[in-house]
């Protein structure tokens, strides 16, 4: 779930040469405030005057010892805060423990971490308060520098809650009543409904604290929050909802040494700002998120000699006991598969996965001491791997994988559509358990990779030549379809019948082993600055090797190498092979999915999946037109940062588009299957059948809108402007499209319904985009915009808005660009063609032309 609050993006600090701003502030306050210093016995006795006696307040209390001492007196919950905890860095971690059906259906489930916040407790006996403060921990300053005083004043702490001190215990420990922050009366510790996007208020009369637990380094509070939401337009259409939550308050460990990120390796990151007297601008960095893996003290010499050693603290994942037994081992195997990669970083036996001990009464899947693969009973078809991160250093403290039960539906769909022609075992509605287990193992490894801090590497699959994906030897040796399991490479749709390919999914590959070594190899250095030259050399060793290329996930595809669901180094060749398989699959669709006496619902869904897969291939190809190879470069690596997709490749892509989607694929939309079924998609209202005519029209229109996309055309103009030799121009693109789409009109030949549809879609795409471009300039349009915009990975917990987006953004005044002129000129040329052809057309074609002329004249203002 995407983070919407700054305190959920809590950032890293820390190394021995630097002091945390926050620590400086705490130190200054403790020295300056006599009320918080050690008191004599007489002073302590006097200090307790004015408070209710400790024994009276807590008479009959159920007490639990831990990080904080917890007292429960009937329905009242008290925290007794040890003096040694005051001023310490604590992290609030909120998770969902249970949900009702409406929230489940929205994709929000047990195990999700929806809110984190760093806090400190401060005791103020003068005002009889315990203040809870938060701060932005990305700021670091050397306490010896003059600027540290200014940093302290300009990056101060903020109060999020104030508790009245009810009494003082032994050693004057403050006792506070905390019900209001856990029962829904206050949002400071747990702001559930805002963070899951529901808004509204907690209905406090129907909300309560269920359980409190204390452990040496954390406390756990379980609550139930109720609310009411509107389901329709009338006041009567309301739904009552109750959500179970677990709040952990965790003592953060001694800060780990961070590691600076590098755009050439895909890790989630957290930002840092370093202030020093010597700098002329603030140093802004990103630190990667990773587990604290260090050799034991007695093994450090062995480790540095290159011997494999076990880490001080291995990583343990617990499998939710609610996981169906037949999938438990596959999920465990997917976790254990990463041990080989960690050996590249010098560590052995790093990871283990197991079921919790049923006799362990302390085990709780919502306790942040445990990393859990949670199994969610839901119709949602997905899996995700978020982590809880130390906001000061990027250290991963705990990870959770949310495994939705219905993810198997997605796997079944992919495998049948993409590989059904080469594997008879994946053709039916239910696969053999061993086939599904292999797919589950693949997904498990991918999601576990995220919990190690790894981001999607969408560019990995581009390293493999398309033809090599048809080789059993190559795919077995190289690990399936990509050198990284963190790509969305999916299943091998390139392989053909008779090729003998068995390894159809990615495995943990060359890039993954490299990334784990780069992120986790221990250097023994004390600061990220010290180890920076070392980590840079590790990357330089493989610079230019496509097996080690990292391609970031893109919101709008600019670099066609880095796409989801694609395979190989040529989308056109891969798409052709994929379509060959789809053409063979389609006639078997009913036989594979429907038994005698059954309705055709499965076949209808299957038909829709085939259409969607065909559309995916066209989209992969589309990205090459106006595409740019974007390389994360550094000085000295001899690479270009921006390379237009080669002219020949763009022409090949346009030819594919003309062949497969600007021409009606009769095999797909005029299939004899339409006598029995229509393509149908799953919706909240159930299975909805669709007209093949409308589906084709919408898919084709989407591709044409993609071709007319302003940013795509502006990228083409950009390289035309820069005088790159042999690049496709906007004029050439329009000439090619017009010559193909209106070829029969130019020859004054009648058009069939599909050809008329294509002309309508083309003109509509031009008109709509042109009208948008010439809309009145709005306030703020002249505000500056960066050429390279920020990228936010949409996958998981540490989406950063300050990472390279790999998207080109252009000034808001697009109406002054050449794109507007080119589109208007194209509309005028199309109108001229139609005008000449109109009087020599048959009735249907003439009606079509008349309609188009009305639209064109209106769009062009009768010019």
Label for each model-derived stretch:
Residues 336-347, 449-450, 454, 491, ...:
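Sec-exported extracytoplasmic/periplasmic mature domains
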């Amino acid at each position: 779930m995407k983070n919407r609050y700054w305190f959920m993006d809590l950032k890293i600090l820390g190394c021995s040469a630097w002091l945390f701003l926050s620590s400086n502030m705490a130190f200054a306050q403790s020295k300056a405030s006599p009320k918080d210093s050690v008191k004599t016995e007489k002073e302590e006795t006097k200090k307790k005057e004015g408070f209710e006696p400790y024994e009276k307040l807590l008479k009959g209390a159920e007490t639990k010892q831990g990080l904080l001492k917890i007292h429960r007196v009937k329905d009242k919950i008290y925290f007794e805060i040890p003096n040694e905890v005051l001023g310490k860095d604590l992290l609030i971690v909120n998770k969902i423990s249970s949900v009702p059906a409406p929230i489940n259906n929205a994709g929000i489930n047990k195990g999700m971490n929806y809110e984190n916040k760093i806090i400190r407790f401060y005791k103020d006996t003068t005002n009889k308060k315990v203040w809870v403060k938060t701060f932005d921990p990305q700021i670091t300053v050397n306490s010896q520098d003059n600027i540290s005083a200014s940093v302290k004043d300009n990056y101060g702490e903020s109060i999020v809650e104030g508790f009245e001190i009810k009494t003082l215990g032994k050693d004057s420990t403050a006792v506070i009543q905390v019900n209001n922050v856990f029962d829904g009366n206050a949002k400071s510790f747990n702001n559930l409904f805002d963070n899951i996007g529901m808004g509204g208020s907690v209905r406090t009369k129907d909300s309560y604290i269920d359980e409190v637990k204390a452990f040496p380094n954390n406390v756990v509070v379980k609550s139930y929050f109720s609310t009411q939401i509107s389901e329709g337009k009338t006041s009567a259409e309301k739904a009552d909802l109750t959500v179970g939550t677990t709040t952990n308050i965790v003592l953060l460990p001694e800060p780990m040494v961070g590691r600076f990120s590098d755009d050439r390796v895909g890790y989630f990151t957290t930002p840092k700002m370093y202030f020093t007297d010597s700098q002329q601008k603030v140093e802004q960095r990103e630190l990667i998120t990773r587990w604290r893996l260090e050799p034991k003290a007695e093994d450090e010499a062995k480790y540095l000699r290159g011997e494999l050693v076990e880490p001080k603290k291995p990583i343990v994942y617990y499998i939710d006991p609610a996981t169906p037994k037949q999938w438990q081992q596959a999920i465990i195997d997917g976790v254990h598969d990463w041990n080989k990669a960690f050996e590249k970083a010098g560590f052995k036996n790093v990871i283990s996965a197991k079921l919790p001990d049923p006799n362990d009464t302390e085990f709780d899947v919502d306790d942040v001491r445990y990393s859990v693969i949670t199994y969610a009973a839901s119709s949602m078809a997905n899996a995700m791997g978020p982590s809880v991160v130390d906001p000061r250093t990027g250290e991963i403290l705990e990870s959770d994988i949310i495994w939705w039960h219905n993810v198997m539906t997605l796997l079944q769909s992919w495998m049948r559509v993409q590989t059904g022609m080469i594997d008879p075992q994946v053709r039916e509605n239910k696969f053999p358990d061993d086939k599904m287990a292999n797919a589950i193992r693949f997904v498990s490894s991918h999601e576990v990779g995220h919990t190690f801090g790894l981001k999607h590497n969408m560019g990995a699959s581009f390293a493999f030549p398309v033809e090599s994906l048809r080789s059993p030897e190559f795919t077995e040796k190289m690990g399936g379809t990509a050198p990284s399991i963190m790509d969305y490479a999916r299943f091998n749709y390139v392989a053909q019948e008779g090729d003998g390919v068995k390894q159809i999914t990615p495995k943990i590959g060359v890039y993954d082993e490299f990334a784990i070594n780069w992120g986790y190899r221990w250097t023994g250095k004390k600061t990220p600055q010290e180890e920076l030259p070392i980590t840079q050399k590790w990357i330089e060793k493989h610079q230019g090797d496509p097996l080690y290329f990292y391609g970031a996930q893109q919101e709008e595809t600019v670099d066609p190498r880095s796409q989801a669901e694609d395979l190989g180094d040529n989308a056109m060749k891969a798409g052709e092979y994929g379509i060959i398989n789809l053409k063979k699959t389609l006639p078997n669709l009913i036989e594979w999915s429907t038994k005698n006496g059954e309705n055709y619902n499965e076949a209808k869904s299957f038909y829709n999946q085939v259409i969607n897969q065909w559309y995916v291939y066209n989209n992969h190809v589309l990205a090459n037109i106006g595409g740019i190879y974007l390389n994360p470069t550094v000085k000295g690596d001899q690479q270009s940062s921006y390379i237009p997709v080669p002219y020949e490749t763009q022409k090949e892509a346009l030819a594919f588009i003309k062949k497969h989607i600007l021409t009606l694929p009769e095999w797909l939309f005029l299939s004899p299957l339409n006598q029995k079924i229509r393509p149908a998609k799953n919706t909240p209202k159930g299975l909805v059948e669709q007209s093949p005519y409308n589906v084709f029209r919408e898919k084709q229109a989407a591709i044409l809108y993609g071709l007319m996309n302003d940013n795509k055309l502006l990228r083409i103009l950009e390289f035309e402007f820069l005088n790159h030799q042999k690049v496709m121009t906007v004029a050439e693109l329009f000439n090619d499209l017009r010559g193909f789409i209106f070829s029969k009109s130019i020859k004054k030949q009648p058009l069939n319904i599909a050809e008329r549809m294509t002309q309508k879609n083309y003109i509509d795409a031009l008109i709509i985009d042109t009208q948008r471009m010439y809309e009145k300039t709005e306030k703020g349009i002249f505000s500056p915009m960066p050429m390279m915009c920020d990228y936010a990975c949409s996958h998981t917990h540490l989406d950063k808005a300050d990472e390279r987006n790999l998207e080109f953004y252009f000034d808001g005044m697009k109406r002054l660009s050449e794109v507007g002129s080119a589109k208007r000129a194209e509309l005028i040329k199309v109108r001229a063609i139609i005008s000449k052809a109109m009087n020599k057309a048959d009735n249907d074609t003439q009606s079509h032309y008349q309609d188009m002329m009305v639209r064109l004249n209106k769009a062009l203002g009768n010019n």
